[in-house]
């Protein structure tokens, strides 16, 4: 008799519960997250078992071990799974059983499992973004120190350019001693971060940028040599999205719709989206609007039509949504971006 297995994964251990075709559940089994113990437990399960596990922050190695053991893994969307379980009580065993029941009933809300090599390559782009965020944070701290002690100047437009660095070095002695040391440490850290970011970007240019999908995405307005790899790697297999709108929604560019009693209202964007992909398309939209090239004037026209009525934020999101949906068709049809005959600005959202 076939069994359906639910795995409630935590940082240090997982709880497994099996449910058979009649809905009878096994006793919960707790397995510590020691790789050998985990692998040995998986070997004891029936061959090619169906296992459901939530996409928590540490699922990579757990899924790898399950697939290595020959099992069929189903990655569950945590928020949707909890809604469908509909429980008021929560225990590890109940969560594992709930996943197993959803899997058995064919109602498990599944997420796509990116292949291992793709997950690994994503780390290049995601680490670059993290280092850039850290660099911005350090720059803000230095700017704040300069302002606190009245050392700002209008003669230098970029405090971290060549002239800006020279200016900071010449005024460093005017800070209190400990503040001066901390500013210098942060300046040194910025140089190290810049070197690491450049090293990562060079790796991206060599290992990822030459790919045919990346080259196609570079035809999208505002998408350059870094944004194209981000978009490609975060999308993965575009065929997992049935429609272009599904990709835009996954990227957090489609507002939620609430309808009741004949009234429809648009809500905000869900927080549970791919934030990396959202950032990439919004960044591309901002770049496309800033450049205002004749070839992509239709993008600026869409932005300008929405700007007066909805403001910059919503207008940019609308442009980003257009770019996301265009990227879907570019990857599906394997064609370069072409300006649409007509952009409909009255689309909801």
Feature annotation, model-predicted:
Residues 1-74, 83:
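Glycine/alanine-rich phosphate-binding loops at beta-alpha junctions
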Residues 1-3, 14, 149, 336-337, ...:
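Charged, often Cys/His-bearing segments associated with DNA-binding zinc-finger transcription factors
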Residues 36, 84-87, 91, 216-219, ...:
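Phosphate-backbone recognition surface of nucleic-acid-processing proteins
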Residues 67, 74-126, 166-169, 261-276:
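Short alpha-helix plus adjacent loop in nuclease-associated cores
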Residues 106-109, 138-139, 197-200, 236-240, ...:
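Short helix-capping/linker segments at secondary-structure and domain boundaries
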Residues 126-216:
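Glycine-rich, often acidic, oxyanion-interacting loops/wings at catalytic, nucleic-acid
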Residues 307-349:
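Basic, amphipathic alpha-helical segments enriched in Lys/Arg and hydrophobic/aromatic residues
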